[in-house]
Amino acid sequence: MATPSMMPQWSYMHIAGQDASEYLSPGLVQFARATDTYFSLGNKFRNPTVAPTHDVTTDRSQRLTLRFVPVDREETAYSYKVRFTLAVGDNRVLDMASTYFDIRGVLDRGPSFKPYSGTAYNSLAPKGAPNPSQWTNQNKTNSFGQAPYIGQKITNQGVQVGSDSNNRDVFADKTYQPEPQVGQTQWNINPMQNAAGRILKQTTPMQPCYGSYARPTNEKGGQAKLVKNDDNQTTTTNVGLNFFTTATETANFSPKVVLYSEDVNLEAPDTHLVFKPDVNGTSAELLLGQQAAPNRPNYIGFRDNFIGLMYYNSTGNMGVLAGQASQLNAVVDLQDRNTELSYQLMLDALGDRSRYFSMWNQAVDSYDPDVRIIENHGVEDELPNYCFPLNGQGISNSYQGVKTDNGTNWSQNNTDVSSNNEISIGNVFAMEINLAANLWRSFLYSNVALYLPDSYKITPDNITLPDNKNTYAYMNGRVAVPSALDTYVNIGARWSPDPMDNVNPFNHHRNAGLRYRSMLLGNGRYVPFHIQVPQKFFAIKNLLLLPGSYTYEWNFRKDVNMILQSSLGNDLRVDGASVRFDSINLYANFFPMAHNTASTLEAMLRNDTNDQSFNDYLCAANMLYPIPANATSVPISIPSRNWAAFRGWSFTRLKTKETPSLGSGFDPYFTYSGSVPYLDGTFYLNHTFKKVSVMFDSSVSWPGNDRLLTPNEFEIKRTVDGEGYNVAQCNMTKDWFLIQMLSHYNIGYQGFHVPESYKDRMYSFFRNFQPMSRQVVDTTTYTEYQNVTLPFQHNNSGFVGYMGPAIREGQAYPANYPYPLIGQTAVPSLTQKKFLCDRTMWRIPFSSNFMSMGALTDLGQNMLYANSAHALDMTFEVDPMDEPTLLYVLFEVFDVVRIHQPHRGVIEAVYLRTPFSAGNATT
């Protein structure tokens, strides 16, 4: 079988060029012949692009780069169209491969942008610790606070902080003193009076200290709200003094503590509440127990290679490259030509996509493999981890000295020993924390549990979330049950959590490419950007444009969901993101050739035997077939046609929600901004296919009955494998594994080996195939099995929160989940197997060289398909999903453009495509 690849066979459109000896200098021809044995040029100069051979760096070389300013702009709410006039002077050749659009504008990433995990404000505070606060109960003010500053005395003017040069008392400036960051510097001082601190009034709504921020209102850092005086001309701070003494005091009521109470502009810029008591009002004693959590990180940047920014489609918004003499447009795009995906796969074939290149915004979408597939090998916590008090002692008591009279009588020793000695008895006081287990548990919650499907999450009590589930506020407010994916779930196994298999793993804050692209723009919401965007359309991205005057125009989208990417995938339109283009210029390069060299090149390229031909790298008609929610079978019918030059099928599955309508410049139903597999190649639903059958309209089976399984049917995975047809400790069949190795790497029945590195890059099947297995309790043979549901399971009880990320509750008690699968008391178990294969597309090769897909006979193969047309029926069996999806099929065809520039200012393009000549698979 011929090796299928994304490039079609060149023999279908051979480009006839002159022999090198006809136009290269005699010296170069002689050099080539003399060195041919060890430096072979081959037919390098038979290509339509002829390299300059002399006079390259002389004073007659042209200037390298020119800037073209648009002659016309047309801006709407959804797009920005620019038109350029490209004037290519005599003896010059414009290199379209080097052109790029230079775009300047302003980007507002919206309030949902959060480029970090955790909080920037009081991140060391316990999640449930309140700010020092006051509240009113039965018309009396209650205070809960801290007084860290120790002054010299307290009067009705407040706390004394020092003395001036005249030895007069200086009292705290209540606009900013006492400062909350200043207190006692030694652990061994335990003052009982003259203490001062700050506290928030009951008119400032309570919230936890974790994540609290109040802007300063003076240059000393004070935060008290400014209030206007009666004359409304000046503003002052309204800070009150609250004096206290001990509750047991009955006689001397001089103050021992003063709290400076104030109202501040309290905010929580990057946190939200996950526990809120049910009380009326914004200040109450119960609200001291509120608990905060950080807002979820949401990186927002332009898509990889600026996917979605330029508009590629033929329905009314087509790009234009036309000679002004002829006005024939060289750009003929088709609705089924996927320019963006083609460019992604081409870059992968050319080099290593894991290397980022900032100029073209090249930073490919990725995910942390430890998040997609969890290797839960437990934690190494053999040694306990302790924390100790600052004094490094146990709990101390006060002791006085005693002495003996050299006998058995003891008496008080107050002559040379203090009467107040702090002595601890026993071991040093300590508290233990299992750091390793807590870090692992926190990793699982932040990286996996919070990304569970929404149906697995809950809304905390007394928290109101918006109805629109695509908003950041809704996604951010929902919480997962930590015990659903705790350290003991699937412990010892390498397994992806089943609910996560169908969740887009690229919509994650560990998408390193998106994080890089987001950080290229900075860490603020408002960004004045200046970007360079390359042309990707295959017919013009490598074109040599000969002298003449040309019209070049293109549309740029302004839809933030299409041109921006967020790690949460929220609806950026609703969440307040916007983009404004201020200028779009075109930068173009001329070949640095001497004029006589350029004129020779022009004369050659004007000849129709040297027309420039370009292949679309993907070379495929791509079709989307809807799969309704919970459907398991997808039939496809292709009308009768000649299948010459057909190379096979590639297919995968997409979510309808994640696939925009490319036919319109603005898709109102595209309420999503995560990765778009249809355009960027972030496929992740390949594991949901069960089998596919291929039937041509004949009685002859294809691809023959010499395979392991049924002719006409490719079985992808088997749940029950009685015959042993599965492979690699998973449920993929040997048949399908061999077909993938054959179609991707030409590694067929001659044995198994690793494909060459240049074929095994980011979108490779071999690199992304991930088999896995685990054991679970056999509920039929284990007679004592009880189906204990999540609310009734307990493990780490008393040390963790219950059914949510809130404060720990309960008591220490033996765990009742999970059942042991190891050791002396291991319960009966079953083995489950599955696989994941992201990024790649399943492929079925079809060799149009054979043209005989019949059964093998002693007469050789039946020439059934040689020159006749046949219809095709395909049926895909898939796993049901609870949302509408799309079957994405690439019919690998032959897609070439041949560009002819016979005269000045004339450009003609001929597009050849077979077997799908027009824009869809029905013609």
Swiss-Prot record:
Annotated site residue numbers, Involved in interaction with pre-protein VI: 748
Gene Ontology molecular function, alphabetical: structural molecule activity
Subcellular localization, as worded in the UniProt entry: Virion; Host nucleus
Induction or repression: Expressed in the late phase of the viral replicative cycle.
Alphabetical UniProt keywords: Acetylation, Capsid protein, Cytoplasmic inwards viral transport, Host nucleus, Host-virus interaction, Late protein, Microtubular inwards viral transport, Phosphoprotein, T=25 icosahedral capsid protein, Virion, Virus entry into host cell
GO biological process per UniProt: microtubule-dependent intracellular transport of viral material towards nucleus; symbiont entry into host cell
S-S pairs: none
Subunit: Homotrimer. Interacts with the capsid vertex protein; this interaction binds the peripentonal hexons to the neighboring penton base. Interacts with the hexon-linking protein; this interaction tethers the hexons surrounding the penton to those situated in the central plate of the facet. Interacts with the hexon-interlacing protein; this interaction lashes the hexons together. Interacts with host dyneins DYNC1LI1 and DYNC1I2; this interaction might be involved in intracellular microtubule-dependent transport of incoming viral capsid.
Function of the protein: Major capsid protein that self-associates to form 240 hexon trimers, each in the shape of a hexagon, building most of the pseudo T=25 capsid. Assembled into trimeric units with the help of the chaperone shutoff protein. Transported by pre-protein VI to the nucleus where it associates with other structural proteins to form an empty capsid. Might be involved, through its interaction with host dyneins, in the intracellular microtubule-dependent transport of incoming viral capsid to the nucleus.
Additional observations: All late proteins expressed from the major late promoter are produced by alternative splicing and alternative polyadenylation of the same gene giving rise to non-overlapping ORFs. A leader sequence is present in the N-terminus of all these mRNAs and is recognized by the viral shutoff protein to provide expression although conventional translation via ribosome scanning from the cap has been shut off in the host cell.
HAMAP family: ADV_CAPSH
Protein name per Swiss-Prot or TrEMBL: Hexon protein
Lineage of the species this protein comes from: Viruses, Varidnaviria, Bamfordvirae, Preplasmiviricota, Tectiliviricetes
